[in-house]
Amino acid sequence: MDSDDDGDRRRDKFARERRDDDSYRRSGGGGGGYSRYDNKRPAGRREDYQVKRSRGDEGDDGFDPVRGDRNGNGAEPSSENSIYSGPLLPFKRFLTNQEDDISEEDAIKKYNEYKNEHRKFQLDRFFRAHKDEEWFRLKYKPEEAKKVKEVQLENVQKRLQIFNELKEQGQFDKFTLDFEDAEAILRMLDSVVVKLENGSEDDLKAVLAQKLDDESLADVKKENKDAAEKVEDQVKDEVKEEPNEEQEEGAIDDETDKASNKVNIHKTCSVFLRNIPPGLTYEELESTCKKYPGFLRLALTDGIAERRFYRRGWATFKRDVNIKEICWGLNAHRLRETDLNAIINRDITRRVRTNNGVAAHKQVALNDLKLAVKLTALYDKKLGLFNAADESESDREKDIRMGVDLVAASTNPLVKEIKSIVPKDTLNDISEEEAELLGVSNGGDSQSDKVRYERDDTILKALDLLIIYLRIVHSIDFYNHGHYAQEDSMPNRCGLIHVRGQPPSGASINTDENGDLIVPQKFINDFISGFNSRIDKGLIEKQYVSEEDMEKMGKKDGEKEVEAFIAINTVELAKDKWLCPLSGKKFKGPEFIRKHLQSKHEDKLEEARAEADFFNNYLADAQRPVDLEPKHMPHMSRDDHRGGGGDRGYGRERDDDRGPGGGRSSFGNGSYDRRPPFPPRHSLGGRGGGGRMFDDAPRRQPVSYRDLDAPDDIP
């Protein structure tokens, strides 16, 4: 009978083909030492798997081969391209494929060339893999991206109309953007939502007469005792008038269904869809959601790289539907053999949130006013509002890129009004040299000085108008330095806003003999600097890709692509006998095939041109999505696997992939599925010395200095 060791050896013969999840989930323990897995598994060649490519036969270089596009239309790469198909090689790994006597200068030059070619190859492969996915087409395909921008412009123009209506009615004069006015701010947000939902004046009156249920109001009560007493008195009066007020949280007290519909017009129910495959289209999802009563709209995100470019979505329904039944129905319905993983989306319970109260200080407010004016002029220009309406998109983009003074050129009536409200030259920027000469480069005071906390109502009034304009028209939450780009498709079409909080407090902030707050100048300067930085990075700055970089990344020429398409469809069969594979017809010469394609298949030639523009749009995006790069594991020696000294043992490596709470991160290493990624397999011997990664990968022979005339018994 065979021994256990013999049986183990026979099983180990096929260890490389087996993927036993349970075996590698068991850690080797401690800071190193062998685990059972380490003893059983021979050396492997592959590093952590790249998420979006399926596992297949391993290439000679130890990296995944190209699988073509997602639909299987791409061909396997040729052998000379195999070095580009995997992750970028480190410099040391790259040198193993070079000559031994290569100079340092040549090595660096060749490595830079390799990096450029690798980048070009990876971008082209990513484009081919995702070009048929809806999110990618909407983002970069010229005709589809144009439609998206047209819809966006329509939404912004409607929001602009609503802003002007509310402004003419004096709605913005009833409050300031301070947290103590949270109730009036909530009423303003509700008014915007009712108008966005095409509600009537009766609907608006019913909504404004409704009792507000928001945690922001409770916070106001806690922060201001006097205001809290007034609110409590109002609540008591309302209780006397409405005896049926005691209801569950979120419930609405109305006498009839008709009144309920009016009150609920600004509220919705929604379902969050966590798992939308990249190939699933908006129309497919929308048709599924329309099967349920009360469906309003659907919002989908772009593909998420960390989740294999799966998307997330929100399906919005009317408030009076049974959202639980709808959620159950969506979970029971599979689309393309995929579960949507729908859950009920929670309502926003705190719609008014606070920024640091120092934002009301005159110096800070003046800085914010300049930023708000710039943002207003910039986003008006981007979307083609006011004087930019007659300009082409390329001309508008050129002006922005060249740094044209958009504030001075703006014809937005609100910008003109702001200029008339604030003192002259308030909005003018000064140069760095002028600031240094005037002694205002650091805020005008020494960093160690303290200044009196001062509010300027004129500046704050102008600032509030601009912030409300940005929030309603452009969906920009100024004090949160965020842009809610998809807000018109989301469940809450004007959901929340950040405002100024209570005046600052802390150990470094005190009061003078008059009871006025005294704030350190350094605190103010640091706050301004940090806020400006976040606004610039989040809302103003845009990275551009130069023409030179686009050429390096493989920019395509539309006419050259057409010529290449014609060449592919021109096949010589014999003398004076040519075939057009596209139509299957035969011609006497290539010039006849060209004429045939230009007359009968002009649409195909246009597709070739459009494909080039499609690809170039992808390259022109500095924030373009790409595949996540797998991590390279360091070469490990034999001693690293043994306990007692190595801090990079196998058990430690797995710990490095864990999330901040100690457990494995849900999407660690860029993996969408919840299984841990396949661990690297290390050699425990052989090849003279410590184990190395990629034992089967080609490598240059070590240089030897052996005397060929020496006897065989002398090494």
UniProtKB/Swiss-Prot annotation:
Acts as a mediator between the cap-binding complex (CBC) and the primary microRNAs (miRNAs) processing machinery. Contributes to the stability and delivery of capped primary miRNA transcripts to the primary miRNA processing complex, thereby playing a role in RNA-mediated gene silencing (RNAi) by miRNAs. One of its GO terms (biological process) is primary miRNA processing. Residues 1-87, 223-259, 629-715 are annotated as: Disordered. Gene3D superfamilies: 3.30.70.330. It is found in: Nucleus. This is Serrate RNA effector molecule homolog. It comes from the Eukaryota. Keywords: Nucleus, RNA-mediated gene silencing. Pfam families: ARS2, SERRATE_Ars2_N. Residues 243-256 have a biased composition (Acidic residues).
